[in-house]
Amino acid sequence: MKNIRNFCIIAHIDHGKSTLADRLLEFTKTIQVTEGQMLDDMDLEKERGITIKSHAIQMEYEYGGEKYVLNLIDTPGHVDFSYEVSRSIAACEGALLIVDASQGVQAQTISNLYMALEHDLEIIPVLNKCDMASAMPDEVEDEIIDLLGCKHEDIIRASGKTGMGVEEILKAVVERIPHPTGDEEAPLQALIFDSVFNSFRGIIAYFKIENGVIRKGDKVKFFNTGKEYDADEIGVLKMDMIPRAELRTGDVGYIISGIKTSREVKVGDTITHIARPCEKAIAGFEEVKPMVFAGVYPIEAEDYENLRASLEKLQLNDASLTFQPESSLALGFGFRCGFLGLLHMEIVQERLDREFDMNVITTVPNVSYMVYDKQGHANEVHNPGGMPDPTLIDHIEEPFIDATIITATDYIGPIMTLCLGKRGELVRQNYVSGNRVEIHYKMPLGEIVIDFYDKLKSISKGYASFDYHQSGFRPSKLVKLDILLNGEPVDALSTLTHVDNAYNLGKRMCEKLKELIPRQQFDIAIQAAIGAKIISRETIKAVRKDVTAKCYGGDVSRKRKLLEKQKRGKKRMKQIGNVEVPQKAFLAVLKLD
C-alpha cells in the first residue's frame, strides 16, 4: 500500500490535460507512442476535444530503487459534468492542477480546485504549454501562487506536446502525494467513481478500495441500491482490463458482475461484502439531478419505438440522462428528456444522430419549476404543458444558480449588461490579476439555458470562462406564454417566462414565425398570449389570385361580386385549412437574439 499513489488531473477545457496524460503514459511505458488522446474513447470526445466520461489507468514507475503503482483518474473539465469530477476527486489523494501558460487560470479550474481542496488533496501545480509562442509563464505562475499560496519552486513547467517536465511530474507525484490510508482487516468499503457499458459483459464498475480486500467470486452488495451481486471478475485497468485474483486497500480496479442496467450502478455508491458489510457508506453520494429538460420527438412518427430503444441504450452508458414519454398535438409522440446542462443535451443529440442514426426534433429547453397551489402543495413541473390552471396557483419558484465568470477587464461592461438582461444580481467582483477579474452573480437557471454561454463567448471574444452551481429555489413571477396560429395553441412553442420578459419574447417569437411559416391561401394570425390575454400579433397575408383581371370596364358591381365570391371561398378555406409549422421554425425560436 505504501507504494500506491492515486491522483487525478484538474484542468479547464482545452488546457491540454489529455495530451499531457498521454505523455505520462508513454514515459512509464504503459502505452506505445500513439496518435491522439488515449483516455478519450468516444469519437465525439476526440472531435470536440473534451473529456466527457471519467477514465482510469494504472502506470508503473521505478523511483529510488522501488517500484510504484500510479493510478491516474482522468476527469472531465466541463461544467455540465462536475458531479463526475467530484467523484473522481474523492477516489484520489492528490491532484495535478494544470494551467495553460497562455490562458491563465479559468473559472472551471477554480471550481474543480476548490472541490479538490475540500477533499484535502495534495495539489501539484503544473504550467502546461510552456513551449508556445504566446505563453506567459511568469505572469501565470503569479496567478497560481495567489490562488494556492504555494512557492515558485513548487510549480512544474511542462509541455504535453514536447514532453518537457514529464519526469519531474512523476517524481513529484511519488514524493508529494501521500499514499492511501485504510485498514486491510476492516470490512470491505469501496467507492464507485465510474461505470461503463460493454455490450458483451454488461455494466463494468470502476472503484477504489478505501478499506478491506475484495477477491474474485466474493458476494458483494451496493450500499445505496441494496442490490447483491457476485464478483465474477475483478482486476486493474491498464490500457485493457487485466484480471486479478484479489485487490487490496488503496487499489483502483474494476468489477464485472453481469449487471444489465446502468440505474443499478450509481456513481458515488459504496461496494461492500454481504457477509461482513461495512457500518456506513462513503460520504458524499448524491443522486445526479437533471437541470435542463426538453422534448425530443422523432421526425417520422413510426420511429417512436426506435427512439425509445436508442435512448435506453444511451442511458446504459450515461446514467444522468432521464426520459419519460410525452405527447404533443403539434409533434406527435416523443419523450421528455432531462439533461445535466446544455452541452450534455447537445452531446446526447449528436450521439443519437451518430450512433443510432436517429433524426430528432428538440423543443425549447426549460428547467424544472416548483408550483405551489392554494393549499400549499408543491408540484414539480418540467414542461410548460404541465402547468395547472393559473387561478389555482399560489406562487411559482424557479431554480437559481451561483455563477462565476472570469474575464479580461476590457469586457466587464458588456458582460454585466448581458447578466442584468438575464435578471442576474451582482454578488461581488474581485481582481484575479492585473487585467483579469472574477465576477459572481446570482441568476435564474432558466435564463442561461438557451443561449447565455454562446453570447458570453461572443461578447468576450472567447476569453470569458463560466462556471455555475445550483443554489436552490426562489419565488418568481412567471407566466406561461402560448403561441396561437389562427386561434389554435401550438403546444410545442409554449414557454414559461418572467412577467417582465413576456411581452418582448412574445413579440420576437411572432415576428420570427412570420418570416418562417410559408404563406397560405388564407390569412394566418400568429398571436402570443398569456392566458386569455393576447399580447402580440402578426398576420401572414394570404396569397390571392387577381379575380377581376378578366373584367373590362363595365359595372363596378360585377367586380364586387367576384371579390365577394373570393372572400367567401377564403373564409371557408380558413375554417378547414390547417397550418404546418416547419421544423426550422422550431429551431429558430430557440435561437432568438
Curated annotation (Swiss-Prot):
It is found in: Cell inner membrane. Its main location: membrane. CDD domains: EF4_II (cd03699), EF4_III (cd16260), LepA (cd01890), lepA_C (cd03709). One of its GO terms (biological process) is positive regulation of translation. GTP binds at D14, H15, G16, K17, S18, T19, N128, K129, C130, D131. Required for accurate and efficient protein synthesis under certain stress conditions. May act as a fidelity factor of the translation reaction, by catalyzing a one-codon backward translocation of tRNAs on improperly translocated ribosomes. Back-translocation proceeds from a post-translocation (POST) complex to a pre-translocation (PRE) complex, thus giving elongation factor G a second chance to translocate the tRNAs correctly. Binds to ribosomes in a GTP-dependent manner. This is Elongation factor 4. It comes from Phocaeicola vulgatus (strain ATCC 8482 / DSM 1447 / JCM 5826 / CCUG 4940 / NBRC 14291 / NCTC 11154) (Bacteroides vulgatus).
